[in-house]
Amino acid sequence: MTKLLSEYTKYGSKFSTVDISTFGILEGISETIVSTGLEYPNAAPIGIIVRDGRLFVRLFRGSHTWANVLKEGYMAANIIYNPLLFVRSTFFDLEPPEFDYVTAHRLKFPILKEAAAWIIFKCISVINTDQSLIADLIPMNAGFNEMNKMNILVPNRGFNAVLEATVHATRYQLSGDKKYLKLIQHYANLASKCGGENEKRAMKLLHEVLER
């Protein structure tokens, strides 16, 4: 691995030699599917945040990801390009055969077999409030899945629309505010217009979830 980004040298080079930019984690919020649970793996879409030189994550209280990070102090960010997997991991538990395991610091961490790449993070400086958990992240290990790695990725509005619709769907389920249904439909139309078959299947599943 290449050296750690200069923004994170405050943690000391002895902690990590992983350059997260190599894996597409840049300034802002990078949408990944995070896997946790050393014994019972779980996966859910989570944004990895880089802001003002700080690398951190925010997890909602009560989720499986929140509980596992609070208990174990580790998480794996999976770089995924399948929109259907984002929807499935938001509303359903993934099956055990969908996970693989990688070793870091003598521990075996669950990652997704479909990931193009993965990064194992140690969660430090954890702040647990009534609503959420915030933790700084130290990248411990990372790798590419050569079978899934794509050389060139062109931004696709349909894929991005699925991500936005999924976020609004979770907000609708929490609040019941119908304004989110209008936003979901807006992004569903965009996914249908600009996306491919995977995006359309993802939106179909999302609508099925909302109709339950």
What are these regions (language model features)?
Residues 2-118, 122-212:
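Basic, polyanion-binding surface patches
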